[in-house]
From Swiss-Prot:
Alternates between an inactive form bound to GDP and an active form bound to GTP. Activated by a guanine nucleotide-exchange factor (GEF) and inactivated by a GTPase-activating protein (GAP). One of its GO terms (molecular function) is GTPase activity. GTP binds at residues 17-22, 33-39, 63-64, 138-141, 168-170. The modification Cysteine methyl ester is found at residue 238. Residues 219-230 have a biased composition (Basic and acidic residues). Keywords: Cell membrane, GTP-binding, Lipoprotein, Membrane, Methylation, Nucleotide-binding, Prenylation. Disruption phenotype: Displays slight reduction in conidiation, but normal growth, appressorium formation, and plant infection. It is found in: Cell membrane. It comes from Pyricularia oryzae (strain 70-15 / ATCC MYA-4617 / FGSC 8958). It comes from the Eukaryota. This is Ras-like protein 1. Changing residue 238 to S: Prevents farnesylation and restricts subcellular location to the cytoplasm in appressorium, mycelium, conidium and infection hyphae. Residues 191-205 have a biased composition (Polar residues). A motif (Effector region) lies at residues 36-44.
Length: 241
């Protein structure tokens, strides 16, 4: 591949001890960390290929402890996509997910209302798009210690409007999916943001004599219309005084 790789900045958030570092190191270094060593801030980079397209992931592993709440705002400002982690064997970590999600929304809304700084992800992803978030129920290997059901995880993800997966950093189950699906959302948002748009429904013509015309509807779906077919739109009037 020639040229510079697309960089995606992902931030891993969640309570202390839920396996944020274990997931990150399993993704980037392909091994499982057995011991728990509280993290303040660690950054990892890895070149990956997602859907036959190479890119660079920058993954920020963050502290889950309450005393680092002030630092978390800056981590969120710098992030493009987020991996929200709880442990299926910890009801309290699951209960705190909404607090992390609220903080993400608050910080991103604040960023959207202020000028973006150089290099800010705000400049590359439309601020009107939802923040890409993956909810991860980690430690799915701890079957006998489960305190949070899979159904509860799905229900919370629907409530928060984000994706959901259960994973095991120890057994390397759904680790790549947890991160790669966030990248896929970011790519879709960038593609949609780069499409030329007009007031109302966005349309791109491929027509000409004897050809069809394609367009994008307001819900993002692609449609088509053959020559001679009418569409409901008001004629454009130009008055020269």
């Amino acid at each position: 591949m020639t040229g510079r790789l697309q960089l995606h900045k992902l931030v891993v958030l969640g309570d202390g001890g839920v396996g944020k570092t274990a997931l990150t190191i399993q993704l980037c270094l392909q091994h499982f960390v057995e011991t728990y060593d509280p993290t303040i801030e660690d950054s990892y980079r890895k070149q990956v290929v997602i859907d036959n397209q190479a890119c660079m992931l920058e993954v920020l592993d963050t502290a889950g402890q309450e005393e680092y709440t002030a630092l978390r705002d800056q981590w969120i400002r710098d992030g493009e996509g987020f991996v929200l982690v709880y442990s299926i064997s910890s009801r309290s970590s699951f209960s705190r997910i909404k607090r992390f999600h609220h903080q993400i929304q608050r910080v991103k809304e604040s960023c959207a209302s202020s000028p973006s700084y150089p290099g800010s992800p705000i400049a590359t992803v439309t601020t009107q798009a939802p923040v890409p978030i993956m909810l991860v129920g980690n430690k799915s290997d701890r079957v006998t210690e489960r305190e949070v059901s899979t159904q509860e995880g799905h229900a919370l993800a629907r409530e928060l409007g984000c994706e959901f997966v259960e994973a095991s950093a120890k057994n390397c189950i759904n680790v790549e999916k947890a991160f790669y699906d966030v990248v896929r959302i970011l790519r879709r948002q960038r593609q949609q943001a780069s499409r030329p748009s007009l007031p109302g429904n966005s349309r791109t013509k491929t027509g000409g004599m004897g050809k069809s015309e394609s367009f994008y509807q307001s819900d993002g779906k692609r449609g088509s219309r053959k020559d001679g077919e009418k569409h409901r739109s008001k004629p454009i009037k130009c008055v020269i005084l």
